[in-house]
From Swiss-Prot:
Top-level taxonomy: Bacteria, Bacillati, Bacillota, Bacilli, Lactobacillales
UniProt similarity note: Belongs to the TRAFAC class translation factor GTPase superfamily. Classic translation factor GTPase family. EF-G/EF-2 subfamily.
PROSITE patterns: G_TR_1, G_TR_2
Protein name, per record: Elongation factor G
Designated gene of the protein: fusA
Annotated localization: Cytoplasm
Superkingdom of the organism of origin: Bacteria
Keywords: Cytoplasm, Elongation factor, GTP-binding, Nucleotide-binding, Protein biosynthesis
Pfam family name, one: GTP_EFTU
Record bears the keyword Transport: no
Molecular function GO terms recorded: GTP binding; GTPase activity; translation elongation factor activity
UniProt GO cellular component terms: cytoplasm
Organism listed in the record: Lactiplantibacillus plantarum (strain ATCC BAA-793 / NCIMB 8826 / WCFS1)
Residue sites binding GTP per the record: 19-26, 83-87, 137-140
Domain tr-type G positions: 10-285
Function: Catalyzes the GTP-dependent ribosomal translocation step during translation elongation. During this step, the ribosome changes from the pre-translocational (PRE) to the post-translocational (POST) state as the newly formed A-site-bound peptidyl-tRNA and P-site-bound deacylated tRNA move to the P and E sites, respectively. Catalyzes the coordinated movement of the two tRNA molecules, the mRNA and conformational changes in the ribosome.
Length: 698
């Protein structure tokens, strides 16, 4: 028997909550869940009791690491919420959730306005064309300034953002908000945990300011809406419904960003934020159709939301749940799926059976019989599915656009404290790397050492912490190491010849290869330019494989050789003695011989670092950046502080948090994201080679 849909598509909202760390994102989500009746006790993040931060380390650290997906109901709408982390080490979680959202709430701290990480997530949201509303949170905080916060959206994000509310008071006197569309004030009763408020006329002392702000709002809407423009120029009255319709239209087109005010912690303004989600953010029917490829015809197809179409969904996260095991979070773009049925993992071309379907509320779960178009849910039983895979009906395989994840930039060696833990550690690392595509674990075949790599120190700290808590593996962690790379800077032509005679069948392989530098990020490209069969066809894949294997270990200090083109253009063979193995070795010898003439260099990851510190400490901060081989790109004022933008090698950033804390008496903060790879200075290169026991290029 078919199940019925609880909420129609136009009454469904898939939203994310995004912000800089500590802007109050998790608390805002908490309050939304409280007022929509999902939780009966408010959890405070700073007490480590938040409902959304469900991993033990999240509760301890008071930051959100994994995007918990939850569902809530408000005014006959279903709202699926994904709480995303604001810490830069976890931007992949943000990117991953933005892929499956239709709209987002950007939370700002009313004292700081737009902060560095806000800019990062805002850019990511723009990449995925996600409409946004802005919530200026923490209006109760000392130094809260609504006007300043709105101005930072214009200045730092170049976004057409306008207030649709004004706060009544600020700091300790923050009492509620003025609705500029209705021209009414909502005043909260402190004792009722935000569940009750009075809607009254705008207080006299705010009337002039509110009218001016409303006029500004209408003027801004006239710029993007012809209907409003005509009435505005003709001096006609514009109805509340027309204003709301224009805001919705502008928001969906990413031409307008409504701004609201409130304090999630003090339980003020959250219900109005929910109203704005329903009024202004898109349903799955309002967004551009999601693109997919038909693997048979290679043609692009649009996935249009609707239950009557073939099933197509994206697996956007894999998590291990202590009670039910492996959970695969999916976003359904079209069609429906019943628990117990089969789907095709179109990415891996494997059939999978969906055991059970769950709707998640943070880390609690409710079993559901079926998911519908537009839903976000978790599936149990998908053994081969990893993040970014396409799940479709067996008859209609589609490849949905896959996700791209950055390579890790930092690695540490981990060793189990006891031999008995080795197997447990291997299982733990395998499960954790399935969950997180930016985390990699590998064993060095020569030393037997296990290396784990990720996006930053905090990222790896949390992985080690999770091994201990979830898998009972105690591990010793080495000092962080940088993921260097090697590349060639010059073109060269070299021979690689391997001849081995020792009685019986010999070995013979002979190749001539031209190596040239490739564009950054293009990786290794192999070209077969053999004419006249001087190297027989069957040995050519072995030459490519031999080069790949040799490049994995580099030529200078054992780091992977990247961004190189290799053209096999000549060689010779022996009728009896040639073999695949001989040509593989010949190729690796060619690479080794290229070292003398190809100008090999070591590349290091360069981080984009944004440092915010009070003006008095600016000299010290800039001095530290320069001392760490950093380049200062520019500075800008941020309230009473200065923000320094710089590019600094990752190798020089270890321990910087402590340095900055002591230099600014705890008042400086910084964020750091990977930007690009760059050649290391000669002296540094020599040190790296020496440390790794490599061979300097002559």
């Amino acid at each position: 028997m078919a199940n019925t849909r609880e909420f129609s598509l136009d009454k469904t909202r898939n939203i994310g909550i995004m912000a800089h760390i500590d802007a109050g994102k998790t608390t805002t989500t908490e309050r939304i869940l409280y007022y929509t009746g999902k939780i009966h006790k408010i959890g405070e993040t700073h007490d480590g009791a938040s409902q959304m931060d469900w991993m033990a380390q999240e509760q301890e650290r008071g930051i959100t690491i994994t995007s918990a997906a939850t569902t809530a109901q408000w005014k006959n709408h279903r709202i699926n919420i994904i709480d995303t982390p604001g810490h830069v080490d976890f931007t992949v979680e943000v990117e991953r959730s933005l892929r499956v959202l239709d709209g987002a709430i950007a939370v700002l701290d009313a004292q700081s306005g737009v902060e560095p990480q806000t800019e990062t997530v805002w850019r990511q949201a723009s990449t995925y064309n996600v409409p946004r509303i802005v919530f200026v949170n923490k209006m109760d905080k000392i130094g809260a300034d609504f006007k300043y916060s709105v101005s930072t959206i214009h200045d730092r994000l170049q976004a057409n953002a306008h207030a649709i509310q004004l706060p009544i008071g600020a700091e300790d006197n923050f009492e509620g908000v003025i609705d500029l569309i209705e021209m009414k004030a909502d005043l909260y009763d402190e004792d009722q945990l935000g569940t009750e408020w009075d809607t009254v006329d705008v207080p006299d002392e705010y009337k002039e300011e509110a009218q001016a702000a409303r006029d500004d709002l209408i003027e801004a809407l006239a710029d993007i809406d012809d209907g409003i423009m005509e009435k505005y120029l003709g001096g006609e009255e514009i109805s509340k419904e027309e204003i709301k319709a224009a805001i919705r239209k502008g928001t969906l087109a990413l031409e307008f960003f409504p701004v609201l005010a409130g304090s999630a912690f003090k339980n003020k303004g959250v219900q109005m934020l929910m109203d704005a989600v329903v009024d202004y953010l898109p349903s799955p029917l309002d967004v551009k159709p999601y693109k997919a490829t038909d693997p048979e015809t290679e043609e692009e197809v649009d996935l249009i939301a609707g239950d009557d179409k073939p099933f197509a969904a994206l697996a956007f996260k894999v998590a291990t749940d202590p009670f039910v095991g492996r959970l695969t979070f999916i976003r359904v773009y079209q069609g429906t799926l019943e628990s117990g049925s089969y789907v095709l993992n179109a990415t891996k071309d494997k059939r999978e059976r969906v055991g059970r379907l769950l709707q998640m509320h943070s880390n609690q779960r409710k079993e559901i019989p079926e998911v519908f178009s537009g839903d976000i849910a978790a599936a149990i039983g998908l053994k081969n599915t990893t993040t970014g895979d396409s799940l479709t009906s067996i008859e209609h395989p589609y490849h949905l656009e896959s996700m791209e994840f950055p390579d890790p930039v930092i690695q540490v060696a981990v060793e189990p404290k006891t031999k008995a833990d080795q197997d447990k550690m291997n299982v733990a690392l395998q499960k954790l790397s399935e969950e997180d595509p930016t985390f990699k674990a590998e064993t060095n075949p020569e030393t037997g050492e296990t290396l784990i790599a990720g996006m930053g120190e905090l990222h790896l700290d949390i992985i080690v912490d999770r091994m201990r808590r979830e898998f009972n593996v105690e591990a010793t962690v080495g000092a962080p190491q940088v993921s260097y790379r090697e590349t060639f800077t010059k073109s060269t032509q070299v021979q690689g010849k391997f001849v081995h005679q020792s009685g019986g069948k010999g070995q013979y392989g002979d190749v001539w290869v031209e190596f040239t530098p490739n564009e950054e990020g293009k990786g290794f490209e192999f070209e077969d330019a053999i004419v006249g069969g001087v190297v027989p066809r069957e040995y050519i894949p072995s030459v490519e494989q031999g080069l790949k294997e040799a490049m994995a270990n580099g030529v200078l200090a054992g780091y992977p050789l990247v961004d190189v083109k290799a053209k096999l253009y000549d060689g010779s063979y022996h009728d009896v003695d040639s073999s695949e193995a001989a040509f593989k070795i010949a190729a690796s010898l060619a690479l080794r011989n290229a070292v003398k003439t190809a100008g090999p260099v070591i590349l290091e990851p360069i981080m984009k670092v944004d440092i915010v510190a009070p003006e008095d400490y600016l000299g010290d901060v800039m001095g530290h950046v320069t001392a760490r081989r950093g380049n200062i790109e520019g500075m800008e004022e941020r309230g009473n502080a200065q923000e320094v933008h710089a590019y600094v090698p990752l190798a020089e950033m270890f321990g910087y948090a402590t340095t900055l804390r002591s230099a600014t008496q705890g008042r400086g903060t910084f964020t750091m994201t990977f930007d690009h790879y760059e050649k290391v200075p000669k002296s540094v290169q020599e040190d790296i080679i020496k440390k790794n026991g490599g061979t300097p290029a002559k």
